[in-house]
Amino acid sequence: MEFKLIAEYFDRLEKISSRIQLTALLTDLLKKSDKDVIDKVIYITQGKLWPDFFEKPEIGLGEKLMIKALSVSTNIKEDEIEKQLRILGDLGEVAYKLKRTNSSQNVLSYLGSTKVTKLTVEEVYESLSKIALSEGEGSRDMKIRSLAGLLKKADPLEAKYIIRFIDGRLRVGIGDATIMDALANVFGGGTAARPLIERAYNLRADLGNIAKLLAENGIETIKSIKPEVGIPIRPMLAERLTDPSEILAKVGGKGIVDYKYDGERAQIHKKGEKVYIFSRRLENITRQYPDVVEYIKNSIKSNEVILEGEIVAIDKESGEILPFQNLMHRKRKNDIGEAIKEYPVNVYLFDLMYNDGEDYTQKPLPDRREKLEEIVTQNDIVKVADHKYIDKVNELVEYFHQAISDGTEGVIVKSIGKDSIYQAGARGFLWIKLKKDYQSEMADSVDLVIVGAFYGRGKRGGKLSSLLMAAYDPDKDTFYTVCKVASGFSDAELEEVQKMLSEAKLDKKDPRVESEIQPDIWVKPKYVAEIIGAEITLSPLHTCCKGVVSEEAGLSIRFPRFIRWRDDKSVEEATTPNEILEMYQSRLKKKVEDITET
């Protein structure tokens, strides 16, 4: 399969703003893709070489090295390439322009004076993989040579998207939900097959692998997909409510209440002596927790198991729970040993998805919890999360206050009914979180995605200091604007914002974004921030839930304030419009009750 086909479709996708048209065009591309490389077509469309959970590096080629490779491949001086980059602002466009005007290649090609070797998808993928995996002495020069060789063979459009892929800026506006829609069209005959594909993806978070299974064996093959040790399951997500009575009613009048720890949610896989730890974003973070690996080996009786829990930083003197930020020291590669000593952790396990050949995701929570307690040998480090069975509102309220006093964020109330399965990748009312924020009228913070930014004035003049934030609707694969946030940033965080936005800047709005506001720059949806504010309110400027509460207005946050970056969350895990609507309706209900009481 020629890489040119992908480049041509990417060029067409970039010009489209309708999700329906995006899905139709991607469907067409997948129909034309050879089944032996369809997994690679999916990965490239996702902007990656392999799933995040693979223990493999990213490409790791900076702008300067790409410019050097482009210079080698075109015989054009680096200074001239840098000049063109300042003019065009997109190295992919620079590559396209230079390849078109590079007469030494194009004249011969068009006159047929030389045989033109066409790039294949396999060749491009293998070359980029080689670049990513190269390390050690001489790897820098090898990467430049490999990329230069690839660009030399590429035509202008291919070069544009090879550079953009490496740069992390494909700009085709395709999310995982759209890919699943297209796969359903190609291999399942339409939307009826979509739930099957999504369930397979939730249990095996590798769309490339799923596409290959579909291409080789058809839709029936994915019906039998089960959890597999070493391949992460997409995490189940909780809804949020603020009224304990409503929460208990939602879960059927009784449930389990778990502490909500302020730590790193972790999915832990064990197979014999091998242990893998994955983040909620499904990234392999085993390297950060070698101590946890040993704890799990010594605490879990099962041979093959997939568990879920929270890794929490602990004060080494008092044993008290420390804030999540203390775990950031674990991300540094060079001093893990020191971080283990200074920032010890506890592991609080709260769910079981797979155990010695048996899929537990379809079992109700009481069965999962019973088996979890059976296979865990609890000690000072590895424990089953603090929890309580409740069937009265006052029990929930008392346990909530106990959780807060013990240094947690609050509680999660979980259904224990027959339908209380582990809903991988889904957000629903089987789990409901109840959190307390002491600094705001909003009952809870929200996690929103940056989709645009505005330049500041006065002291912040010339800097992008106000961020356009959006909620994510997974059913529509669409981001809806909620607020502009400009407060809460330290000077250091504001400098970090400049770097982040320069790397994510787009020439035009991402097709998945619905906005009636025109920011100074559009941003690729990739960064999630935790935001708090005074209250959820109506706004004619924002698109979140527009037409739901009011025909003229959407929902927004009054006096929004930045709290922290949520690096542990993907954009698809951001707060949904439905959650914001629930928060708005709960606030209205409370106001009515307050008025009635007076």
UniProtKB/Swiss-Prot annotation:
Coiled-coil region(s): none
Cofactor: Mg(2+)
Catalyzed chemical reaction(s): ATP + (deoxyribonucleotide)n-3'-hydroxyl + 5'-phospho-(deoxyribonucleotide)m = (deoxyribonucleotide)n+m + AMP + diphosphate
UniProt keyword terms in alphabetical order: ATP-binding, Cell cycle, Cell division, DNA damage, DNA recombination, DNA repair, DNA replication, Ligase, Magnesium, Metal-binding, Nucleotide-binding
Active site: K260 (n6-amp-lysine intermediate)
Gene3D superfamilies xref list: DNA ligase, ATP-dependent, N-terminal domain (1.10.3260.10), DNA ligase/mRNA capping enzyme (3.30.470.30), Nucleic acid-binding proteins (2.40.50.140)
Biological function: DNA ligase that seals nicks in double-stranded DNA during DNA replication, DNA recombination and DNA repair.
Family under the similarity heading: Belongs to the ATP-dependent DNA ligase family.
Name of the protein this chain belongs to: DNA ligase
Organism whose genome encodes this protein: Sulfolobus acidocaldarius (strain ATCC 33909 / DSM 639 / JCM 8929 / NBRC 15157 / NCIMB 11770)
Originating gene: lig
